[in-house]
Amino acid sequence: MSFNIMHTPADLDAALDASQERPIVIFKHSATCPFSAMAQLEVANAKHDIDIYGIVLQYAGDLSKQIAERLDVEHASPQAIVVSRGKALGHYWRSQIKEQKLKEEVAANA
């Protein structure tokens, strides 16, 4: 599996295209937030089993808004969104972001 950094709308398109084949996780986080640092550890541990597409909010704020709009989820940070077939199946923020929870939701929708 992989960890991919998104910067552009084309990167988001590629992530949503990838979700047509198998569920993915979109991970949005801040480079300066302690909650983001904890969530990033959980997501990093899951990267061996899940394709993850991440953005750093300080560098991709507009892309974060597009993700919220296109997936019809409220913006949060940090936030992990499980996506399958271009649709959000679930989204988690702050302390809700747990490696096992992400793996279980992805496996249930594979």
Stretches with model-predicted labels:
Residues M1-D13:
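N-terminal "domain-start" segment that seeds a small globular fold
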Residues M6, K28, I50-Q66:
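Thiol-based oxidoreductase modules, predominantly thioredoxin-like and allied folds used
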Residues D11-L12, P34-Q40, V56, E69, ...:
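A structural signal for the main folded, soluble domain(s) of proteins
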Residues A14-A46:
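Local sequence-structure signature of Cys/Sec-based thiol-disulfide redox active-site neighborhoods
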Residues K47-Y53, K101-K103:
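Short cysteine/histidine-rich metal-coordination sites, predominantly Zn2+-binding motifs
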Residues L71-S84:
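Structural micro-motif
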Residues V82-A110:
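Non-catalytic, surface beta->alpha helical segment in thiol-disulfide oxidoreductase systems
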